[in-house]
């Protein structure tokens, strides 16, 4: 990682993303915007990296760049989506973030 990994973002397993989109298409109101997200899957980047590294049997390495190099990286530290409108349509994620990552890694492993 090129920063401390404390950035906090909303991630979602693709199967949950698809079911969220279908929920909005079938039950949402035309012209309304919905965030396809799950509050329980909001995670710090360093924790996300740790889950992936643990699965791969690797260690997360932090390489903090100097000021000039870091100028090219995003300054965002938080990008969390509010899922309340989607939840009000009856949608709920079926996979937690760790399960989604492991399932993704298993699929990638199977095709390589």
PLM features: what roles do these ranges have?
Residues 1:
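Conserved small/polar residues in nucleotide/adenosyl-binding loops
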Residues 4, 33-34, 46-49, 57-78:
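C-terminal "lid/loop" region of Rossmann-like NAD(P)-dependent oxidoreductases
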Residues 6, 14-18, 23-35, 40-41, ...:
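Glycine/proline-rich active-site loop of Rossmann-fold NAD(P)-dependent oxidoreductases
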Residues 9-15, 43, 81, 92-96:
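Residue-level signal for the nucleotide or nucleotide-sugar donor/cofactor binding architecture
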Residues 17, 21, 36, 45-48, ...:
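Non-catalytic, hydrophobic alpha-helical segments
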Residues 25-29, 56, 108-112:
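Short, hydrophobic alpha-helical segments
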Residues 53, 86-87:
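Residue-level preference for well-ordered alpha-helical positions
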Residues 97-112:
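Amphipathic terminal alpha-helices
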